[in-house]
Amino acid sequence: PAWLSLLIAPFVVLNVIVGLVTYITLLERKFAARMQSRVGPYRVGPHGLLQPIADALKLMMKEDIVPAAADRPVYNLAPIVFLVPCMLIFATIPFAPGLGVADLNIGILFFLAVSSMEIVGLFMAGWGSNNKYALLSTMRAVNQIISYDLPFIFAALVPVLLAGSLKLSDIALAQKGLWFIFYPVIGQLAFIMFVVATLAAENRVPFDILEAESELVAGFRVEYSGMKFAIIQLGEYAHIIGSSFLGALLFMGAWAGPGPEALGPVWFLDRKSTRLNSSH
C-alpha cells in the first residue's frame, strides 16, 4: 500500500542514524582512551563492540528520577522536544541519487531552520530542571546559538550561490567536476567558517561552555537520568552526524566518486566520517 511505502524510508533512515549514534559514542570513547594511554571499553563483546548496547540497556533499566522542585510537564517533555528537530534534519538529506526521505526544493533552508529549533528543547530542559547549573548552561546556549547562526548561514550560502539552487541534491550534482571546497579562497574560507560554526552548534571544544565539566558538571542535562538522559544524548549525537552529512554534501561532493553509482552512499559515509573527525 501507498502509506506503507511512505513510512519505509523514514523508518530505515531513523534506524541507520540510531546505529551510527550508537557506535560513534563508542568510537569517541576509544579515541579518548587512546589519547590518555588507556584501553577504553573492552569487556562487553569482542574488543568492546557490544558496549553501546549494554549501555543502552543499562539506561533503559535505570530509575527515572524527577527532582522534587522540577516543573514536571516541562521537564518530562524537554528530551522529546530536543530530539525531534535533531532527527528531522535528516528528512531532506539525499544519501545518493534518489535515495532519501524528501528532497525538498528548499532543502538547505529546511535544514537550517529545523536544526536551530533544538534550542527550544534545550532551554526547556534547563528551565524545567529548576537547577541553577542547568539554567546557567541554557543561558550560555542561547548566547552561543545567536553567535554561531549567522556564520553558519553565510558559510552555507556559498555552495548555494555556486550551485544556483537551495536543493541539496542539486548542490551535490553541481560538484561533479570540482568540489566546492577546492574553489580558490572562497571555498576554503566558507568551509573553515562552516566547521567553526558547526563546532559551536555541537558544543564541542573549544565551544563546550554549555557543559564545562569543571563548573557545570553535565550542563543542561545534569538532573536527567535513565531513558531521558539517553534521549538527550541520542539527539546531540544525531545533530553531530547530520551536520557532518551536510558538510560533506555542501563542500565535498557528497556521493560523487570513482566507480559505479551504487558506491555513492559509501563515498558519502566516508566523507561524512572525515567531516565528523574534524568535530572531535
Task: Walk through the language-model features, giving the residues of each.
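Juxtamembrane inter-helical linkers in multi-pass membrane proteins
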Residues: 33-56, 141, 145, 204-229
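Conserved small/polar residues in nucleotide/adenosyl-binding loops
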Residues: 274-280
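Juxtamembrane/interfacial segments at transmembrane-helix boundaries in multi-pass membrane proteins
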Residues: 1, 97-110, 154-190, 261
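N-terminal cationic and glycine-rich segments that engage phosphates or anionic surfaces
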Residues: 90, 169-226, 230-236
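Transmembrane alpha-helix boundary signature
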Residues: 63-68, 87-101, 123-127
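Mid-bilayer segments of alpha-helical transmembrane spans in multi-pass integral membrane proteins
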Residues: 84-91, 110-125, 146-164
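Alpha-helical transmembrane segments
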Residues: 9-17, 105-116, 180-199, 265-272
